[in-house]
Curated annotation (Swiss-Prot):
This is Chaperone protein DnaJ. GO terms for biological process: chaperone cofactor-dependent protein refolding; DNA replication; protein refolding; response to heat. GO terms for cellular component: cytoplasm. The lineage of its organism: Bacteria, Bacillati, Bacillota, Clostridia, Eubacteriales. Binds 2 Zn(2+) ions per monomer. The keyword Transmembrane does not apply. Its main location: cytoplasm. CXXCXGXG motif repeats lie at residues 150-157, 167-174, 193-200, 207-214.
Amino acid sequence: MANKDYYELLGLQKGASDDEIKRAFRKLAVKYHPDRNQGNAEAEEKFKEINEAYQVLSDPEKKAKYDQFGSAAFDGSGGFGGGGFGGFDGFDMGGFGDIFESFFGGGGSNSRRRNGPVRGNDIEYTITLTFEEAVFGVEKEISVTRNENCEHCHGSGAEPGTNAKTCPTCSGSGQVRVQRQTPLGSFVSTSTCDTCRGTGKIIEKPCSECRGKGSVRKTRKIKVNIPAGVDTGNVMPLRGQGEHGLRGGSPGDLYVRINVTPSKVFTRKGNDVYIDAHISMPKAALGTEITVATVDGNVKYTVPPGTQSGTMFRLKGKGIQRVNSNGKGDQYVKVIVDIPKTLNKEQKEALYDFMRASGEEFDEANVPKKKLFGKNK
C-alpha cells in the first residue's frame, strides 16, 4: 500500500492528539483482532495496517518524520538519495505485540518471540557546521557512545565456559499464554515470562565484564563525509552505526542531524543566497561597476544608470550547490542607495545646481551663498 495515510487508517485528522490516536487504535484493534476474525484474511490485513499506523503515530520521533516526509520516510524513498543521504529506515513490524500488550496485557496471537534477534536502537547526533563547511562539504570526526556486544562473552551475557539454561517456566519461548477477561471480552494473549524476563534463558553465572547484560557502553570515533549543500534540518543516516542488536539482531542506524551557523555576509534560502550592495546616489544615477562577494569569491557587476534603491539583480548559478548534484542555486544582489545624513557646503551647492538643471522648484533662500574673492557674498 504505497503512500499510506496513517491518520486516515485510524479514522483521524492530521494533528490528532496522543489520546485520540490511542482511542482510535484501541477501537479498531478490538474490531479487527485475529482472535475475533479467525480465517478472515481481510480483517487480518486491516489489523496489520492499523498496527503499522499506530506504531508510527504513537512514537513522537517516528510521528515527526511521518508528518514531514509521509510514509516515504519509512520505505527508503524520501530524503536526499545518494552520497550517504537517504530516507529513513522502515520500522520494526515485529512491534505489533508490544503495542497490543499496552492495552490488553499481552501481545495477541501473532506476537513475536521475545527471545529472538532484536535490532539495535537508532542513535541521533546533532553536528554544527560553519556556513562555509555546509556550502562546500566537509569530513568530520564525531564521538558516539553506544551499546556494543560484550567482547568477553560475545553478547551471550554468560561467563565464558558456562552455558545459559532454558527457562523452565516458558520452555525457552520467553512468553506465557494468558487468558484475560476485559470489558471488551475475553482475550487469549501472551505476556512476558517473569522468570527469564522474556529472554527464554536463565544465566546462572553472569559475565564478569557486562554483568549478564550482553552489552557494554563504548565511545567510538566515526568519520562522517558531509556533502556540499547541506542545510539546517537535513538528516544524514549512517547505516549500521547505531547500537548493536541483541541475540544476533542487526545494529541500528546513526542519524546525523545538521545544524548550520548563519553567515555574517550571506542570507541563505534553500540553495539561493542573498546579499546587499550599498552604493551612493551619484553612482546609482550614473551607473557604476561594483565588487560583489559570492560563495566562490568576488565578482564584478555593472549596475546600470538610474538604478533605484531596492532593485534586485540575479547572478545565475552563483548560489549553493544542490546536495549530490552539479546544479547550483542563484545569488541575488539587492542594491541599497545610501542617502547621506549630512552634507558639506560644496555637496549642497552641487545638489541645488542639479535641481536647477532638472527644473525643480525650491527656496533659493536655503542655497548657500557662493564665495567671492574668498568671502561669502
